[in-house]
Amino acid sequence: MAAAPAVCASQGSPPGAPSAPAAAPAPAAGLGRCRMALLLAVALDVAGMAALLTGVFAQLQVRGRDFGDLLIYSGALLVFLSLLGWILWYTGNIEISRQELERDYGLRPSALARLARKLSRRWSAPAAAGQRPAPGSRRARRAARAPPPPAAGSRRVRLQLATLEAGPGAAGAGSE
């Protein structure tokens, strides 16, 4: 028995990825492509209805306190939360052709897209020490101003400069 994927699998490849020429999308099975979302929705519905009906029809009292209301409210909450699973399952099974997707949501240059791309590149830039920053970037300018790191095996010498005051009788300390 094969395990179902944890997330809904898309049928197309990402926009920048090369597509396989002979790979046709797999037809959706009877339950659709997002089986985990369907399983979540059904499980929450069953648990919610069981709690709700138990709270309505069972006389649950512990030490004189009635717990029917707690089960009714928690069951209603679980049934409401199952809507998220149903929405995920439904939206994961919507099929849109690549042509329709590009026609409706084609890449339009916008300031927001440029800003998102710039932030994404900056945040995902490799932080490894061996890789150099792009020339002209803020990181490259900062690296140019910073002193180079000390070489392996070198000693660090601290030099402190102080002002010297000439006392009476010192060379060059006469009045002119």
Curated annotation (Swiss-Prot):
Q: Does the UniProt entry include the keyword GTP-binding?
A: no
Q: What S-S linkages are listed for this chain?
A: none
Q: Which residues lie on this side of the membrane: Cytoplasmic?
A: 1-36, 91-176
| Principal cellular location given in the protein's record | membrane
The biased composition feature labelled Low complexity covers 9-22, 124-137
Q: Is Phosphoprotein one of the keywords UniProt gives this record? A: yes
Q: Which GO terms describe its cellular component?
A: membrane
The compartments listed are: Membrane
- Residues annotated as carrying Phosphoserine in the record are 175
Identify the stretch(es) annotated as Disordered.
1-22, 124-157
Per the record, what ranges lie on the membrane's Extracellular side? 58-69
Q: What is this protein called?
A: Transmembrane protein 238
Species of origin reads: Homo sapiens
Task: Specify the taxonomic lineage.
Answer: Eukaryota, Metazoa, Chordata, Craniata, Vertebrata
